[in-house]
Amino acid sequence: MHFIAISINHRTADVALREQVAFRDDALRIAHEDLYETKSILENVILSTCNRTEVYAVVDQIHTGCYYIQRFLARAFGFEVDDIKAMSEVKVGDEAVEHLLRVTSGLDSIVLGETQILGQIRDAFFLAQSTGTTGTIFNHLFKQAITFAKRAHNETDIADNAVSVSYAAVELAKKVFGKLKSKQAIIIGAGEMSELSLLNLLGSGITDITVVNRTIENAMKLAAKHQVKYDELSSLPNLLESADIVISSTSAQTYIITNEMIERIAENRKQDSLVLIDIAVPRDIEPGISAITNIFNYDVDDLKGLVDANLRERQLAAATISEQIPAEIHAHNEWISMLGVVPVIRALREKAMAIQAETMDSIDRKLPGLSERERKIISKHTKSIINQMLKDPIKQAKELSSDKKSNEKLELFQNIFDIEAECPHEQAKQQKESKVKEISARRIFSFE
């Protein structure tokens, strides 16, 4: 069995292509089932976000498995197989495990160290698990990856520092006010940066937010989308009298907020602090306003300095997390190697306990007068003898897990003890056959 990961992401395809290869949420369960029913696939998890579409799979053959996954993606989105090959990257074995660990911990994200991907990986795994397309390997590996990512984030605080301008804007406001939940905010503009700033304000706990824009329809649309207030740009002077935070991002060629405007409203603000954050180029807020008492004015250069410093902190944290990945891969490989040993040990124990049971039956027939106490003592001691006899063989079997010729030696081990253990590959194939029947039955039932 082999583990492969096929990824279409921000490095391999531009956003125009990524938009065309994203699964709708309501189509993912069927997609999991369709892929699982494909030849060569033994387990699979599909991850589909705005920045990546990835298929993780356990396959019986690498080349065949890759082809059928690429064909599955091509058919799902109306591409040729060669198109999918050109826009994706393929990871196999240890590289695939490393890829999953890096993705889950945010090291492979556009925004280094972001935590949203962890939840998305978890949701993808849970969906696959509930659909029935995961088995022994992925049930272990994905839990390991999720646990690793949680620990990495907790130990390094990689996600604590803002590395986007819109997020940094909110962080600056926090430096002035501390908690923002009770504050009033104004968003000037209705474009992409304004929406990102609005989302970050909502994420900080602020609910009293007003969107203002030169075109009132655009302000109305953005406000309705996020259930906040809106107003005309001409109302800005009045709104400023009670606002605590203003984030401005327009394409205006003249200042939206001037020194004169702030001086006029400052008299009515009773020395309350006002944070003005200008993320527009050219600037929306006239320079020099910060000279007025309790007015804090930041422009895009101030934000860039904060973002750059925070990015350096994240890069250091990312390096620390990366150093931990080889140990995780090693732990996974050790666990995988034990998969072939466990059935052998189980078969050996079962045979030994069967012999012990036969021996006790023979003793019962030959010594029918034994009391229950005497019988328990004999049973206990025969089991103890068996455990002592099995101790060294079991130890040797476990050591074979790391041997390069483990399969051959485990087969010899089974021949010596005259036992037969089912290999993990056969178990996986049987498990798949059973689950495919369940999926087919489920579909027939749904159709009826």
Swiss-Prot record:
Domain of life: Bacteria
Pfam families associated with the record: GlutR_dimer, GlutR_N, Shikimate_DH
Molecular function as annotated in GO: glutamyl-tRNA reductase activity; NADP binding
Metabolic or biological pathway, per its Swiss-Prot or TrEMBL entry: Porphyrin-containing compound metabolism; protoporphyrin-IX biosynthesis; 5-aminolevulinate from L-glutamyl-tRNA(Glu): step 1/2
Enzyme class at the top of the EC tree: oxidoreductase
GO biological process: protoporphyrinogen IX biosynthetic process
Site (Important for activity): 99
UniProt keyword terms in alphabetical order: NADP, Oxidoreductase, Porphyrin biosynthesis
Positions bound to substrate: 49-52, 109, 114-116, 120
PANTHER family reported for this sequence: GLUTAMYL-TRNA REDUCTASE 1, CHLOROPLASTIC
Subunit structure: Homodimer.
Miscellaneous notes: During catalysis, the active site Cys acts as a nucleophile attacking the alpha-carbonyl group of tRNA-bound glutamate with the formation of a thioester intermediate between enzyme and glutamate, and the concomitant release of tRNA(Glu). The thioester intermediate is finally reduced by direct hydride transfer from NADPH, to form the product GSA.
Family statement: Belongs to the glutamyl-tRNA reductase family.
Protein name: Glutamyl-tRNA reductase
Organism: Staphylococcus aureus (strain bovine RF122 / ET3-1)
